Amino acid sequence: MDVLWLTLADPEPRHNGQFVYSGGLIDAVAAAGAKVKVLALERPESPRRNGAGGENISWQLAEHDPRSRLASLASPLPHLAHRSFTRSMRRNLAELLESQTWHSIVFDGISVGWALRPVQRWFLGARDRPKLVYISHNHEESLRAAVASNQTSGVKRWGIQIDAAKVARLERSLVDAVDLVTAITPEDGDLYRARRPDKPIDVLTPGYCGRRLDRRSITAAMPRRAVVVGSFDWIAKRMNLEEFVNAADPIFATAGAELQVVGSGEESFFDRLRKGATATEFTGRVKSVSPYLDRARIAVVPERSGGGFKLKVLEYVFNRMPILALAGSVSGVPLHDRDGILLYRDHEELAKGILTVMDDVALLNHMQERAYELCRDEFSWSRRGQHLLSTIAAL
């Protein structure tokens, strides 16, 4: 099967959930036997260049051409898709559509939603067009609406609401046009089915290929520390983190506990949070999160906005970190409150819950062992690739 795979950018290095998911699926589909041609933007931090190839994968990388959020205001495209709506990407897409016969064209995320119209125009009137697949990373319409409603600044909320309306229009167009939609969680799948019950919707949770610890023992000798790992470049991630730090930091400081935030984000954002924090450390981007997980007792998922599948949850599970989270923030994994995870209603309850169990090392070890047991055999990338290919072939 010859697959034209359209995605935002070269996924290397895979330092956030979007790149982990895209890169994992591309590798898995190629390993399952498809010949995959990937069209994406170059990334300066990646060693890969245009024309690079591997077994069953070849890369057509358009010039790196950053586009500002302000530039998208005048476009009918949302900022997510406007980023890759470059002259080089459009030219490369036209060349690839003309170059050969494709069995399937994959729209990997709403970021390449702009490509729908040129693809439709190219195959207008064709009796045998490729199967079109939309790989969703979130149910974007509901997610962006939630992010806008949680924004406290009136001006920012107005801007986010306008962009959210653009997202909704583009996502609906993609869902209506393609032959198959994949959802990253069962909950997202239900949202797509509610509007289009006639559309083939398949749940395609991520796989995991990172570090797995055979065993780990949390002891009283370890720092009384909880850790939040993530990429904090997106506004929803920053909102979640700021709300949690504001609630947790004074409680942790009083209890003599530590909160460590590990991951990338604008330094000005971290500097602002540092000014009001006593018990919280912000590391910025690190080469590996493993040493930070090894020195913490608890992993935290404090996300009120953001939707979708949290790939860091798998990293926590397979590194044997007991997880405490906001209710509703952990989807797509076989963990349930008091069975491999502890869930709380709001940030204050979450912070207090962390301190309640911080010194109960027997409970913490039971939690990490149970979560590992529940997830051990559930997140294979190879099975994801085989499943996606067989689903496309059956359309």
Where are these regions (language model features)?
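Acceptor-binding helix/loop patch of EC 2.4 sugar-transfer enzymes
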Residues: 67-79, 133-166, 328
